[in-house]
Amino acid sequence: MMLQHPGQVSASEVSATAIVPCLSPPGSLVFEDFANLTPFVKEELRFAIQNKHLCHRMSSALESVTINNRPLEMSVTKSEVAPEEDERKRRRRERNKIAAAKCRNKKKEKTECLQKESEKLESVNAELKAQIEELKNEKQHLIYMLNLHRPTCIVRAQNGRTPEDERNLFIQQIKEGTLQS
C-alpha cells in the first residue's frame, strides 16, 4: 500500500520506473529524481535496493558453488552470504535469553516476598483476633465484678446518680453487649 500525498497521481497512473528510480535504465538517473521523494518512498526505495543486491549475491553464490554438479541448499548460501547477520541474531537471542531468565527470577523473588508478607500479616491478624477475644472476656469479667460490687456501694457518683441508677445502667450495658456479640 502506498501513501498518496496531495497533488500526486495515483499508483495506477505511474510506471514502476517513476516510483522507484533505480529501475530506470543506468545513466538516466539525475539528482532531481531523488530530491522530491517522501520519507516513506525513500524507505521503500532503500528496501528495494537492498533486496536487489541480496538477490544478486545469492544467485551468484548459487552459480559458483556446486557439489557433485548439484547446487548447494539455499540455507548454506544464506549463511555464506550473511554470517554477520547470523552472529547478530545469535547475540540477540542470547541477550533475550538472559533478559528472560532475569525477568523470571525477579518475578519469582517478588512472588516469594509477597507470600512472606501475606503469611506475616495473617499471623498478626490471628494474634489481634485472639487479643480481641481476650479483651472481650476481660470486659465481661469486670462488668460482672462491678455488678457484684454495686449493691454494697453507697458512694454517690460524680454525676449525681445513685448506685441503683448505676446498676440499671450496668444491666442495660450487659444487654446491649450480649446483643452485639
UniProtKB/Swiss-Prot annotation:
There is a cross-link at residues 78, 175 (Glycyl lysine isopeptide (Lys-Gly) (interchain with G-Cter in SUMO2)). Residues 86-149 form the bZIP domain. InterPro entries: AP-1 (IPR000837), bZIP (IPR004827), bZIP_sf (IPR046347). Induction: Up-regulated in regenerating neurons after nerve injury. Rapidly and highly induced in regenerating liver and mitogen-stimulated cells. Residues 88-110 are annotated as: Basic motif. PROSITE patterns: BZIP, BZIP_BASIC. It is found in: Nucleus. The modification Phosphothreonine is found at residue 162. GO terms for molecular function: DNA binding; DNA-binding transcription activator activity, RNA polymerase II-specific; DNA-binding transcription factor activity; DNA-binding transcription factor activity, RNA polymerase II-specific; DNA-binding transcription repressor activity, RNA polymerase II-specific; identical protein binding; protein heterodimerization activity; protein homodimerization activity. Disulfide bonds: none annotated. Expressed in tissues containing skeletal muscle or smooth muscle. Expressed in cutaneous and muscular sensory neurons. Residues 76-96 are annotated as: Disordered. Pfam families: bZIP_1. This protein binds the cAMP response element (CRE) (consensus: 5'-GTGACGT[AC][AG]-3'), a sequence present in many viral and cellular promoters. Represses transcription from promoters with ATF sites. It may repress transcription by stabilizing the binding of inhibitory cofactors at the promoter. This is Cyclic AMP-dependent transcription factor ATF-3. It comes from Rattus norvegicus (Rat). The lineage of its organism: Eukaryota, Metazoa, Chordata, Craniata, Vertebrata.
